[in-house]
Amino acid sequence: MKQDETKALDREIGDYVAENTKVIWVDNHTMQIATMMIDSYGDTVYVWVEEAEDHCRVSDGGRILFKLDPNSEDEELNETAKEIAIGSGYQFDDDHFEIYVDVDRKNVAQAALKLAQLQVAISYLG
């Protein structure tokens, strides 16, 4: 009985995520994902996926730090966000304040959801 309940709950969680996550193509190589995550401002968290020949780049497009510090003046905030991103297994572009990771196609969903969670956490720094 417990195993059936666990499997049912697994399906329900998967269904919920699928129903509350929207993916659109913005061009021939880039997807925009509106995740089910909500940041500290109450806004939907977005993730972008750019397809390349041998990998996909999953990124925030530099948007979370732009939202927190539009003029890029808060060096401590940017450095803290960078440390958190790198510590979470992501890369950080110092020029564009973009958080990203390059992954195989099979790992895009996992990387996108983890990046959305990371953006939520970083949003509370502001």
Please provide the spans of the model-predicted regions.
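N-terminal ordered "arm"
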Residues: 2-59
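Generic hydrophobic, helix-prone segments enriched in Leu/Val/Ile
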Residues: 12-13, 80-86, 112, 119
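Secondary-structure transition/turn motif
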Residues: 34-39, 59-67, 101-106
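Solvent-exposed, charged helical/coil patches
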Residues: 97-126
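Intrinsically disordered, low-complexity regulatory segments enriched in Ser/Thr/Pro
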Residues: 45-82, 89-98
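Short glycine-rich, low-complexity/disordered patches
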Residues: 22-33, 91-98, 124-126
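Terminal targeting/leader modules
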Residues: 14, 90-94, 103
